[in-house]
């Protein structure tokens, strides 16, 4: 199951029909639609290539490692700058 957003305006659509999850009105012209996966997903998972899964796992680990390294470098570069709170609301 997933969620897709559509920013197209439908002239026949009510302007009150776009609501957020918390019940507050959302932006006009946006609509969330649930998308259900197919019933036979267990059969599809058997056909996944293990080499492809291994590659995807290594790639995702590399991306996370690079992101953590980049965060650590930026954090160490700017850690000596004090945080100044603003008194103006």
Swiss-Prot record:
Q: Does the keyword Cell membrane apply?
A: yes
Q: Which domain of life is it from?
A: Eukaryota
Reported modifications of this chain: May be palmitoylated at Cys-3.
Q: Which key words tag this protein in UniProt?
A: Cell membrane, Lipoprotein, Membrane, Myristate, Palmitate
Q: Which InterPro entries match?
A: Small_membr_AKAP
In the record, which residues receive a covalent lipid, type N-myristoyl glycine?
2
Output the Pfam families linked to this UniProt entry: SmAKAP (PF15127)
Subcellular location, in the record's words? Answer: Cell membrane
Write out the ranges of the annotated region (Disordered).
1-29
- Any Gene Ontology CC annotation: plasma membrane
- Return one GO MF term: protein kinase A regulatory subunit binding
Q: Where is the composition biased (Basic and acidic residues)?
A: 17-29
| Keyword Membrane annotated | yes
Q: Which family does it belong to?
A: Belongs to the small membrane AKAP family.
Role this protein plays: Binds to type I regulatory subunits of protein kinase A and may anchor/target them to the plasma membrane.
Name of the protein in question: Small membrane A-kinase anchor protein
